């Protein structure tokens, strides 16, 4: 992962993203590529590492500026393949490890992937298999 690209975002830059964090993001890219061969984690059109980095990792990293560090939880509604939730969880390991990231996803297969990634990377996440938007219809 090119630190110059990641460091172009204010909070990420101010905290000087560690080599370890960049390595974890690279591991995530590899896991996405591998699992995407079996199930549709991300668009099949975006399969090269550089495209995944730019389209998903870097785009997702931008949200770090909007995570309120005064709270101990944040959530990603309809996380799909884990963007931005997994990226936030990876970066939060260094910023505020106690923050739990709740990832809501309706796809059973994607939830399994999210749980595998979270466990393998020791992320502070909770994967919730639920169509959150379906619940809102009854409100």
Label every model-predicted segment:
Residues 4-69, 120-121:
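Class I SAM-dependent transferase core
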Residues 71-80:
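Conserved class I S-adenosyl-L-methionine
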Residues 81-96:
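Conserved SAM-binding loop of SAM-dependent methyltransferases across substrates and taxa
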Residues 100-105:
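Conserved SAM-binding motif I beta-strand of class I
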Residues 110-112:
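Short alpha-helix immediately C-terminal to the canonical SAM-binding loop
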Residues 115-125:
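Short, conserved SAM-binding/catalytic segment
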Residues 129-134:
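Conserved SAM/SAH-binding loop
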Residues 137-139:
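Conserved small/polar residues in nucleotide/adenosyl-binding loops
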